[in-house]
Amino acid sequence: MKMPSINVVFKEKGISAIARSARGIVLLILKEDTLPSQTEVNLYTADDIPKELSDSNREQLELTLRGYVNSPKKVIAEIISKDAEDYTDILKTIENKRFDYLVIPDIEENHIDTIATWIKGMRTNKNKRIKAILPDCTADTEGVINFVNKVIRTRTKTYTTAQYCGRIAGVIAGTPMTIACTYAPLPEVIGCDVWTQEEMDTMTNAGKLFFFFDGEKVKLGRGINSLVTTVQGKGVSFQKIKLVDLMDMSTTISARRHRTITLASIRIAMRIAACW
């Protein structure tokens, strides 16, 4: 799979067209020296960002909320202590929360694979259709988006790969279901890595998501996740962020409907039993 040409057509057998646009939910795990009064905050606009957070964490939330065509449906901030040795406790906390994309801007390199493994387990064993945007993570799974830019410069700041994962999550979450995030522009970025066309094709084939300068603007390459190894029942369609989002949405809606029907059936059965 190479970088896309100008005319891109996305097709997937078995997925019906979704007429309405949808926005995803991004959950960020943020570290603070001093825990605020609220350690979980739901944000819909930049006005909702708590002033008591550090400047760097406030910036992370603002970056995520920028989105793309739309802003994300919601951004959830989970605040943990900077002294936390790992993410075991917070992963237990968020396991049953409803969100689509996980981001940890301050993630240490030795924890990246742990988060990728957790995402795989949630998707495979618990049918929780969540995904993570992780820096330099060759997880080889549709649940992990492997963001790899090393040079990220705006007019005011230079960012690490991990620090810009929230911005990428916001772009993906703010992409309507009618289009893909491929070629989504990042107008604030004025400097980024430089690659040849062949290098970008190789990176795309390796399941790496990146942005590049096309001579006029900085924009995302092909909207893909880290899945490289395809098997029967999980083909190249599972490598595309948009199609996985559509499939995950379908699975989630079906599961919710099943739970609703099951609960209704239980209530009816209880009423009948009460009459006996």
Predicted regions and their residues:
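Small-residue-rich
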Residues: M1-N149
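A glycine- and small-residue-enriched flexible loop/hinge signal that marks low-structured segments
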Residues: K92-W276
